[in-house]
Swiss-Prot record:
GO terms for cellular component: photosystem II reaction center; plasma membrane-derived thylakoid membrane. This is Photosystem II reaction center protein Z. PSII is composed of 1 copy each of membrane proteins PsbA, PsbB, PsbC, PsbD, PsbE, PsbF, PsbH, PsbI, PsbJ, PsbK, PsbL, PsbM, PsbT, PsbX, PsbY, PsbZ, Psb30/Ycf12, peripheral proteins PsbO, CyanoQ (PsbQ), PsbU, PsbV and a large number of cofactors. It forms dimeric complexes. PANTHER family: PHOTOSYSTEM II REACTION CENTER PROTEIN Z. InterPro entries: PSII_PsbZ, PSII_PsbZ_sf. It is a multi-pass membrane protein. The chain crosses the membrane at residues 8-28, 41-61. The lineage of its organism: Bacteria, Bacillati, Cyanobacteriota, Cyanophyceae, Oscillatoriophycideae. It comes from Rippkaea orientalis (strain PCC 8801 / RF-1). One of its GO terms (biological process) is photosystem II stabilization. May control the interaction of photosystem II (PSII) cores with the light-harvesting antenna, regulates electron flow through the 2 photosystem reaction centers. PSII is a light-driven water plastoquinone oxidoreductase, using light energy to abstract electrons from H(2)O, generating a proton gradient subsequently used for ATP formation. NCBIfam families: PS_II_psbZ.
Length: 62
């Protein structure tokens, strides 16, 4: 269970780095806003799901 928790945490951290770079770039380019909006919503949903998964796994590990 500890390995699954560590993998989920690594995925969350790496995905957070991607979002930290990707979201400002998407907001800064107004001509691609219609293309970027669904990706931002999808990325936000994936990030939120990863947060919940890490929280649940943290409950079982500790």
């Amino acid at each position: 269970m500890s390995i699954i928790f560590q993998l989920a945490l690594i995925a969350l951290v790496l995905f957070s780095f991607v979002m930290v770079i990707g979201v400002p770039v998407a907001y800064a380019s107004p001509q691609n806003w219609n293309q970027s909006k669904p990706l931002l919503y999808l990325g936000s949903a994936i990030w939120a799901i990863l947060v919940v998964i890490v929280a649940i796994l943290n409950f079982f590990v500790i």
